[in-house]
Amino acid sequence: QLRRKGYQVAIYDRYDRAGGLLMYGIPNFKLEKDVVTRRIERLEQAGVQFQLNTDIGKKLPLAKLRKQHNAILIATGVYKARAMAAPGAGLQGIVPALSYLTVSNRVCLGEKVKAFDDGSMNAKGKNVVVIGGGDTAMDCVRTAVRQHAKSVTCLYRRDRENMPGSLREVGHAEEEGVVFSWLAAPKAFQGDKSVTAVRSIRMRLSSQDGSGRQAPEEVVGSEFNLPADLVIMALGFDPEDLNGAFGESDLAISKWGTLTIDQRTMMTSLPGVFAAGDIVRGASLVVWAIKDGRDAAEAMHTYLEAGAQVARTAAE
């Protein structure tokens, strides 16, 4: 939208391909990568410049970027995987969901990926346990099925009705052979060097917790083992240390670690620096990121037009 209005637009991306989660996070069977690639090519043809392998804050300071551009939009998303402090969590064969999906997508893009070839991020022939109940967990279980896993189990501490992910995705996964272990949570991970089982316990739902959902609590004496050669942790995502990453102490951060913006202008506490998407609202859906992006483009246009008007008035 900004390019259509005549602005020069540059996109800085830390990865070697543009597209973010559309390219590396969402499985190919849900969003074919040639669709994303075609859209990127259309943007390039329209004059949008892509600066790849550029990690803002590490490779290029945000302060320097602010001097180079009249306005900046931060739309980095939330990528920090939530960890689980459980005995055995450091065993080989326990991997973050996004790392697993990224490897799978790179393979689909025709890359030769060591982590896939050596089996560490490949579900073929393995008993796979995915821990989590969101859409990312569903992407992982369905990817594992397509990699010809021996078995795929989704371990979730609440029941089907209280699952945050799409129930349609759950239905698709069940049709493909995924087993859902509802009201169950991991207690520990067993194995010597590599994981061999997930020590789990049955849960029950009690009164509502602070989020308004029924809180899960352990059922004493209900522990059981799930065989596992590959455990995929899909517990959700949090923002990275944004002040540390960007080197801007004046950048206002919410108590959840997301960026604080003026909801009317979509501007952060730094003049001319806007933010949109998951980095503001927390981990959410692509459709919301698209809406936020469109709203941010209009907000940036309004800001730039106002600045141009001031400059014209001063010149008269």
Protein language model annotation of sequence segments:
Residues 1-56, 82-87, 99, 137-183, ...:
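Beta1-alpha1 glycine-rich phosphate/pyrophosphate-binding loop at the start
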